[in-house]
Structure formats: C-alpha cells, structure tokens
C-alpha cells in the first residue's frame, strides 16, 4: 500500500502531514547502510548490544535500555526510524518474496547491478508439484538472491512471505498465492518454504526472516459488495482447528518461522490484529513463536476507521499492542502510541515487549553485528544464475498439470507436427506468467517463443486480452488452425480477472473465450491442445466433453520460464507430473455457495467446501493429473491391521468407556508411545516414459457418533517419486494415530475415533482397526 493510500485512511489533516513526513523519512533512509554497530564507529563499538559474542536476549535488553520512548515508538512501524546517536540506521521491514524477490513492498528495489531476480512459478503452480524438497530449494535460492541484494544495499532481510491461507472458495482472487485447498499441503508447503528462506544456521541465526500470512480465516477480498476491510468471518472452533489455523501452526512448529502476519478481517466479531486470544494466547503462547507479529498493511487503521472497533485511535493502538502485535505495517502506531501511553492505556513496558521481539529477529539476522556476516560473499553474480533459471524451469515442469489427453494425442512430434497454430490471448504473454507479488524477472520465454523452438508457428491472438470482448479476430484464428498440423490454444485468466482486491463472480472463461476455443477446434485439421493459465479453477466442462479438444493442460501461472515448460511438455521433452491442489467445481457451485459463508462442512442444501467436505459433482477433483506414462500401486509389505491407543490415565479411560462418541481425545493419550504403522507403497511405472508420480495417502475415519464430523476423507501424507520406465520405486509413509487418524470435534478438540479407518492409496484400500488399550 502506498504512502498516499495510508494518508487517505487516517482522515485527519494534521495526521496526513505527519504521514507524508514519515514517508519522506522512509524514502530517504531506505538505502542507508543496512547494519549497525560498525566497528569503525568509535561511538558504538564498545556498546554491549554491539557485541556479537553476548547472548542476543542480553543485547536486546541493553539496547532497549538506551532508547527513549519516542525512539521506541518510531520503531513500532515498518519504516523504522534511525537512531543516529547509537549508530542505527532506518530500516524498511516490508519486503515480499512470494515466489522470488518482489518490488511490491518498499523494501526491495531493482536497477543497476540488480536489474531483476529469478521469478519462479506462482505458488499455486509450484504447489501442484507436491514436491516438498522443491519447495525448500526454491526458498533457498530466493534467500540467496535476497542476501545478495541486501549486500548491495537494495533490499532488506525481512520478507512477508509465504501466504498460507486456505483456498476455501474457487473465486478468491488471491488463491493463486496459496498452496491450495488442503490444510496439510499448505502446512507442508509453509514449513518447507520457510526452512528454505530462513536457512538452518547454528545458534538460532537467520539467513532471512520469513513471515506466514494472513492469520486467520482470510480468503475474501472483494465479493458482491463485501470487502476484506469490513468482513467478519464467522468461523466455528472446529473449522479453525482443522482447517484455517493448520498451516500457521505448522509454520511456527515445523518451520520455526520468524514472523506471523495478522489479517484485515474480523474473526467472530474481533479484528485479528486486536485479538489477544489469536495473537498472544495462541501464536505466542500455545505455539511458542520465536519472532514477531506484524499487521497486514494499515490493519490497525482499518479496525479503527473502517470497522469502528474502538472509540479513539489511542485505544486502537493500545488494543493491538496489548493483544500481541509487535509491528505495524503503516504509520498508525507511530502516530498514536505515545498518546495511548499518556492516557494510561499502555505502559512503556508493553512497548518494550513488542520491540524486544523485532529487535531479537534483527539480531538473529546479524544486523547488529557490524558486518555483513557469513553471506557477505553473495552479490550480483549470485542472482539470476543459470542454476536458478534452470530451477525455475524445472519447477514449472513439475507443477503443470495434464487434465485430458484423448487417444494419447500428446506429446506432439516435431517430425509430424511441423506447423503449429498458436492461438489465444495468453499465447504470447510474459508478465502474466508470473502472477502477482512478482518482481522483475531475469528473462521470459512466452508460450509462442517456447513452441517456436519445436515447430514453425502461425500466431493469432484471437481476441484482445483475456476479457475477450469481441470475436473480430476469430476468422484469422480459424484460418491458422486450418493450415497447421496442430493447434495450441493458450487461454485463461490474468490479474485483470483475479487478483488482490478482485474476486471472481463466476468460474467460466471470460468473454468470448469459450466460443473461440469451440470455433478453432471445429476448424483445426490437427489435434487441438487447450492450455489454461489461471490461479483459480475454471469450469471447462465444454472442452472436457468436446472430442475435438484432444488435450487440456493447466499451467497455472508458470513463472519466467513458463513458455519453455509448456512447450517442453507439449512436445514430450518433459513428462507432466503435476496434480491439482484444488477442486475444480462446475459453474453452478457458485450459485449455491456465498463467499461469505465460512463453514467447511456440508449442511442441508449447503454442499460444503473442498474435497474433504464437498458433496457434489466436480469438473476435475483435487489431486487429479495425468502423465504420458502409467503407474500402479501395490503394498510391498503387509501393513499392520490394528493399532492400540494407550491412555494417559485412568480418568481418561473412564471417559472413553462412558463416551457415546467412541473416540479418545488426543490430549488424553500417550501419543509419543504409540507405534507408528509403516506403509511401504511400491510404485511401478508400467508405461514407456520416465515420469514423476505423487503418492497420496488419504484417511477415511469411521462414522461413530462424533457430532458434526462430516469429512469425506483427508490427506494425511504425500510423497513425490521419480520412476524410470519399466522400473519400480518403494515409498515409505509412517502412519501416526495421533497425527494422521485424529479428527476435530464440534468444540475444536482433536479426537481419535475408535473403529475401522480406511486408508486410500490410489486404487488401493487398507483398513486399520483402532481400539483403546485399557
């Protein structure tokens, strides 16, 4: 959000002037030297907070003791002020690295020695790879480039990424930024990407500081007159525990993330950035966050000025800080916190607690060590390297999903398909491929450019832009299809259709796109391949059922190398192995389900959400994706058929014996003592192509009286495996009763149902009898 927009939100002439002054200070200080405690500075080199060999918590307290109240307050906001008398420069906390270094936030700038950075596929596309090691490796590369740019003075070290909200509704404009609809996938993605970004340095040190956002139940931007600034998400404890909060908990527990961002919306009547239970009690208390909590930009201003949650701005400042907020993206706390102290709404100690969390992260990053630290050797030569570009291409290969391939029409042959018509509004795009929250890419390969490496191309856009408001270009597109040996239609969406602040109203292709596909398919003398670029699902039932459309590919937003990856898959240089990370619903789904309804489970005429709870027809299901080869599954070893759950005490046993739900609370069990049940899944490649395959393990719980359970099945594990043609690979998944077989009851408590649990691995089914050990 720009400084101008921030000023508009405050709504007071005096404050507007202050805001612009703060913005001017930010703009002049953002490229100051990015570390304090320069050993050449005789004023600071002897200060205790500058001694890298002193424990960080001691250094933080020493620095806090030297700051005035006003200096502390000016460091509660993203454009933190300099403290020249202590040799501390200003710092911009807000940088973005969703799928590469971005210049969306003010913390990173491109130009000079750093004209761009590697732009990987949008997250929804990378998620479709279901490859945890790939996710972590992308994070590692992004952090290399971040450190290089930091060393060059054009970027910071605090990145407000990843976005791990659940893709609850297919219309959400920001669904493209997320790992999809499944909370376990989002949780694994969150932990993997955060580990890649932050590194694994000894001594609790950080390479860069990641931030998981937007906590919590945020997945509506602007729909049917309801926007994120005014939306109150009414969410049950059950849905919070088993859906919305799962990725954030994993971010903190498994990923050890350095920051969590609270969201604009309210949850059950409270702004998330002023909710002590969500912030102080849950993130910092239960989950033990080792880091800071930051607001989404201007969230504190939003809950005062737009949600009218408090009577005065000083009360808003106090409520947010006392709830556990440490840093405000925006000027609000810099302006109103001192007044809150004077009115007795806050103490200086409250401010110290918040500031200690941000200073600790900066010290873990080495920003007070007086030098650039262990990554000082990284520079311009380490950005956009050949290896990084290759990883961007490989990520696109792994994430692109083959949805239809009638009569094995793909791959095309360069010998037989020498002329290819390349048609559609997305056929020669570049920036569209990198989605939102992107930076300046190293270089682009559009679909047209990629296909041109394999065949002579006849190019026609067909319509002007994805809105496709007219059919004037259809005739030329049909003529090209008649002449070519094969036709590739590159259709779909872009940021004008789905984006932050822009939710969709329907799921169909925009404008005349469907008509263009149908007419070109009728005219084409060769096979027709439909390629879709989008973040959210599209109802393409017409193409799925049209025999003249031989193949359908979903490319998501495939990144800077997207065109090369699409072409490689079409011509068989790469074998598609992606799987859909979200359900593709039919158009009539949106007529039944308002975006404002947060309930996950089906009830009455309400069909539920995501594959876990939705009961209805789909265009393509979650986890669907074809390959040029075929795979079969078998169980290499006979798994256990029974698991016994031991109880932690006699009272718990009595509870279970008298329970009508036939389940045990996870909190009443000895989870650490349970034997894990290994599943050895043998994956055989029975086709002619080498390929990658995702092994999904779903659990279907017994129906045994747990009220409001309503789950069809839930993913408990997934593994990516590469198998050569004619070969086999064995994948081991260890099933943990507490972790994998538990469900959440209507009160938000995790329970293990007793009875027969069904595990689904492809076409395989295995039943486990779970019973109490009394």
Swiss-Prot record:
GO cellular component: apoplast; plastid
Main location: secreted
Domain of life: Eukaryota
EC number: 3.2.1.-, 3.2.1.55
Signal peptide range: 1-30
Protein name: Beta-D-xylosidase 1
Annotated catalytic residues: 296
Alphabetical keyword list: Extracellular matrix, Glycoprotein, Glycosidase, Hydrolase, Secreted, Signal
Enzyme's top EC category: hydrolase
PANTHER family from the UniProt entry: BETA-D-XYLOSIDASE 1, SUGAR HYDROLASE-RELATED
Family that this chain belongs to: Belongs to the glycosyl hydrolase 3 family.
GO molecular function list: alpha-L-arabinofuranosidase activity; xylan 1,4-beta-xylosidase activity
Pfam families, A to Z: Fn3-like, Glyco_hydro_3, Glyco_hydro_3_C
Protein species of origin: Arabidopsis thaliana
